[in-house]
Structures are given as structure tokens and as C-alpha cells.
Amino acid sequence: MIKVGITENSIRMEGHAGYHRDGQDIVCSAVSALTCNLINSLENLTNVKIRAETEEGYTKIQWENMTAAGRILVDSWFLGITAINQEYNCIEFV
């Protein structure tokens, strides 16, 4: 199960979906792709300053002074992981 915590100034994710064995888990791959894209987009397409920590099974993104453009990117990321969870039920929002 991937645990996702969202606050006004951060996103924290930890764990694995457990949908398939390591290296073949399409749920973990999809969540990772969306999250990497969020980090890259916030860094390159907005003026939002972020701090991102990533390790195996753990990601934390923090920011201050979120812009409207940054909020749209975070909302888009959230829509994506919500859709994944509706299909595979492997994400717990905490």
C-alpha cells in the first residue's frame, strides 16, 4: 500500500503498491512517473521553490509560497493518483 499525505505545503509518500513483484509493478511505476513529472514541472515551469527528497519507497516534496500555476500542477498530480487508486485500490490517503 502506498501511503500519501498531503498538507498545504507538502506531499509525502511512502511504501509500495504491492500490485506485482518489484520491477513489474505498474501501479508503483505510474505513481512514480506522475510524481517525477510533478517535481520536474514545479521546478521548470513555475517560480515555486521546492525541496524534494526521494529514496526507494519514499518521496517528500515541500514548498513555500505556492503559485496558481503550481497549484494546478499539484491538483493535476492528485487527479492522476486518485484515478490510479480508483482502478487498483493501492493508495491510502493519510
Residue ranges and their predicted role:
Residues M1-I26, A33-V94:
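N-terminal intrinsically disordered, cationic/polar leader segments
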